[in-house]
Amino acid sequence: MSLVTDLPAIFDQFSEARQTGFLTVMDLKERGIPLVGTYCTFMPQEIPMAAGAVVVSLCSTSDETIEEAEKDLPRNLCPLIKSSYGFGKTDKCPYFYFSDLVVGETTCDGKKKMYEYMAEFKPVHVMQLPNSVKDDASRALWKAEMLRLQKTVEERFGHEISEDALRDAIALKNRERRALANFYHLGQLNPPALSGSDILKVVYGATFRFDKEALINELDAMTARVRQQWEEGQRLDPRPRILITGCPIGGAAEKVVRAIEENGGWVVGYENCTGAKATEQCVAETGDVYDALADKYLAIGCSCVSPNDQRLKMLSQMVEEYQVDGVVDVILQACHTYAVESLAIKRHVRQQHNIPYIAIETDYSTSDVGQLSTRVAAFIEML
């Protein structure tokens, strides 16, 4: 059963946001508004926002420019890194082209070396992320890195960031997080109210919506409509409920979601950077602003952190809240931290929750679509 409303058209608008958003970016540039590009959820967006800049996620989820990237980078490197670099080098990403500053981060060794080459053709500021998040030294490092970013932004754009402006940015970003979370929490409904593909269209597409007030209002209205229609009986057929974890997913990696839903499952939740990992926790709006920002961003359960207890905690929470029947761990080829951590995730899911787990290694090509479908079909049949 499919939802017979105009909601699918709205979902498609979010899906197309990346393609159409460059017109908005051109308008922002013509109005003299600074643009800051980012690749990672660890980047504290509130800091450039407080300087009046617009933050945009840069292109990194297609194999379109990987061949060009491999002229400079190793072939056996994560496709996300090669895609990021390739889009920048070729100027095929309008968001990169119009960015006044790119903020990178040391979430993996490949990325931090890639940023050295990227800095040859674009201003790049790299934040040094601590490997651990539990000790005072790591926390002090991250607070210092946020202040260093603030100084770079202030000098780059000639705009001093006040505490009031930072608090306003925190409040606005929190409202956006809550609106997104309220939307993807619809995945907790059983039977589902909408497919995982539609959830992903909206959550991924929202990163290319730059008017945050309009985005918040649109998300709130859409969430209310979906929930109302579900309560009126417009529901999808019951199927095995799948939680996706692992590497960032969007663009070419959406083939995993399609494989799941074309073979009899529903993706009801995303624990990864595209979903709850980046959005579930807000920044405290009281107390010291830098302490509050540090608390939020150091709570991101990324595999680059050791130990990564926060990821296990969030997985447990989502398995229960989303009534999950199986977990699919998506690992991009040559992503060492997520690949190594997959054993810990498998043990946790099976031993703590007694539900099936499968790890899927993939890249941005279409060459493994058939194999993906076969493996996923067997996994779902087992459920």
UniProtKB/Swiss-Prot annotation:
<dbReference type="GO" id="GO:0006974">
    <property type="term" value="P:DNA damage response"/>
</dbReference>
<dbReference type="InterPro" id="IPR047678">
    <property type="entry name" value="YjiM-like"/>
</dbReference>
<comment type="similarity">
    <text>Belongs to the FldB/FldC dehydratase alpha/beta subunit family.</text>
</comment>
<dbReference type="Pfam" id="PF06050">
    <property type="entry name" value="HGD-D"/>
</dbReference>
<protein>
    <recommendedName>
        <fullName>Putative dehydratase subunit YjiM</fullName>
        <ecNumber>4.-.-.-</ecNumber>
    </recommendedName>
</protein>
<dbReference type="GO" id="GO:0016829">
    <property type="term" value="F:lyase activity"/>
</dbReference>
<keyword id="KW-0456">Lyase</keyword>
<dbReference type="InterPro" id="IPR010327">
    <property type="entry name" value="FldB/FldC_alpha/beta"/>
</dbReference>
